[in-house]
C-alpha cells in the first residue's frame, strides 16, 4: 500500500473514531433522559450515568464485527433522537406534552424501522429491466444481464450468490457481464470458488464476461486467495476476463472490457475502439462511471457500470454527485448516441444496509434493426 493511501486511510479511521465517540456521548445523554435513569440519578447520579454509558457500550460491540455498520447505526440513532428533539421543541412551542420517555421510544422505533427497511433492501435482490433500441443491425435481439458489486461475504455468500444465478438463468440471457467488485478483501476463498462455479452453470448464447473493479485485486494482504487465483477460478468456469480488451461477438456486436481506473496502464476509450466496425453495436464495460465524456466521444453505443452502489446509504448518492465523484449514481442516461447504465449492484461494500437504494441485477433487452 502506498504512503499516500496509508495516510488517507489513517485519517479516515481517525475521523471515524472521533465521529463514533461524539455520537456515543450524545446517545449516552439521550439514554440518561429516560425516567428510570432520572429516578436513579436522584439517589445514585454516578451509577445512573454509568448504566446509560453501559447500554451504549453494548452497541459498541458491533465494532468487533463491522466498524462501518456500527457507524451507520450510531449516525441513524443520533439522527432519530435529534429529529424527535426537534419535534419536542415544536410541541413545546404549541404547549403540547411530549415526555422524554415517549420521545426516546419513538426515536428508537423510527430508527429501527428505517434501518430494518434498509436491511431488506440490501438482502432482497430485485430484477431491474431496461429496453433499448438501435438502428444498427444485430443477428438477433440481445438480452444481457449486468451484475456488479457482489462484494461476496456481505449480503451474499457463495451459496446465496448461486441462488441468485438461478434467477438470472430463468431470465434466459444471451450474455451475462460481471461489471467489477465481484469479491472484496473480506471474501472467503470458499465463497469465491462457489460463486465462480455458479457462474459456470449459466447457459447463455454468448457466454459470461468479467471486468475488474477497484476491490477485486484486494487492498490488503490478509485475504486467503490471490487475484491470480480469482482469475483462474473464473476462467476454469468458462468466464472470460477482459482487461482492456475488445472482442467481436458472433460477427454481430463488440464487447469491450476496460481496466478499472484504479489500475495502472489503463487504455483510453478511443484506443479501445480504434479499428472497430462502426456499423456494429458496441458495449463497453467500465466498473466506475467516471469517464462519460470520452466514452461518448468514442461513439460507444452502451456503457455499463457499477461501483456507486446506487448511493448505498442516503444521502451519500446526492453528495457524491454534487462533488462530481462520479458522472452518474444510478440508472440510465444518454449523451449523444451513447446510452449509459449504472446498476446499484447485487450487494454492496461492508454495510449490509441500503437506505439510498436497493440491491439488483439489470436485465437489458437490446432490439436491433
Regions found by a protein language model. Give the residues of each.
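Soluble catalytic domains of enzymes that build or remodel membrane lipids, polysaccharides, and related
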Residues: 136-369
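Generic structural signal for short, solvent-exposed loop/turn connectors between secondary structure elements
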Residues: 56-72, 92-103, 127-129, 133-142, ...
Amino acid at each position: 500500500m502506498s504512503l499516500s493511501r496509508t495516510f488517507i486511510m489513517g485519517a479516515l479511521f481517525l475521523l471515524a473514531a472521533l465521529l463514533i465517540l461524539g455520537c456515543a456521548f450524545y446517545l449516552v445523554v439521550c439514554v440518561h433522559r429516560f425516567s428510570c435513569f432520572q429516578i436513579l440519578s436522584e439517589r445514585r447520579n454516578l451509577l445512573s450515568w454509568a448504566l446509560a454509558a453501559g447500554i451504549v457500550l453494548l452497541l459498541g460491540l458491533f465494532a468487533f464485527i463491522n466498524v462501518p455498520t456500527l457507524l451507520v447505526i450510531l449516525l441513524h440513532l443520533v439522527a432519530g433522537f435529534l429529529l424527535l428533539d426537534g419535534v419536542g421543541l415544536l410541541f413545546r412551542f404549541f404547549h403540547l406534552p411530549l415526555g422524554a420517555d415517549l420521545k426516546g421510544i419513538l426515536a428508537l422505533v423510527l430508527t429501527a424501522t428505517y434501518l430494518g427497511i434498509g436491511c431488506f433492501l440490501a438482502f432482497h435482490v430485485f430484477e431491474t429491466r431496461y429496453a433499448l433500441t438501435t438502428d444498427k443491425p444485430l443477428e438477433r435481439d440481445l438480452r444481457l444481464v449486468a451484475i456488479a458489486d457482489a462484494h461476496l461475504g456481505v449480503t451474499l455468500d457463495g451459496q446465496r450468490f448461486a441462488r441468485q444465478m438461478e434467477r438470472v438463468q430463468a431470465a434466459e440471457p444471451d450474455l451475462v457481464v460481471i461489471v467489477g467488485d465481484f469479491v472484496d478483501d473480506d471474501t472467503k476463498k470458499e465463497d469465491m470458488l462457489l460463486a465462480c462455479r455458479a457462474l459456470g452453470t449459466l447457459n447463455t448464447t454468448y457466454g459470461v464476461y468479467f471486468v475488474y473493479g477497484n476491490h477485486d485485486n484486494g487492498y490488503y494482504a490478509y485475504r486467503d486467495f490471490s487475484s491470480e487465483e480469482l482469475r483462474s477460478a473464473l476462467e476454469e468456469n468458462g468466464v472470460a476476463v477482459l482487461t482492456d480488451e475488445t472482442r467481436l461477438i458472433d460477427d454481430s456486436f463488440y464487447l469491450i472490457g476496460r481496466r478499472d481506473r484504479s489500475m495502472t496502464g489503463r487504455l483510453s476509450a478511443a484506443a479501445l475502439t480504434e479499428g472497430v466496425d462502426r456499423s456494429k453495436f458496441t458495449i463497453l464495460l467500465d466498473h466506475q462511471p467516471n469517464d462519460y465524456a470520452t466514452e461518448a466521444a468514442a461513439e460507444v453505443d452502451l456503457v455499463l457500470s457499477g461501483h456507486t452502489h446506487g448511493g448505498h446509504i442516503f444521502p451519500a448518492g446526492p453528495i457524491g454527485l454534487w462533488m462530481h465523484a462520479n458522472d452518474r449514481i444510478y440508472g440510465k442516461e444518454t449523451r449523444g448516441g451513447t446510452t449509459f447504465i449504472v446498476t446499484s449492484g447485487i450487494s454492496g461494500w461492508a454495510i449490509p444496509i441500503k437506505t439510498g437504494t436497493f440491491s439488483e441485477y439489470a436485465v437489458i433487452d437490446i432490439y436491433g434493426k
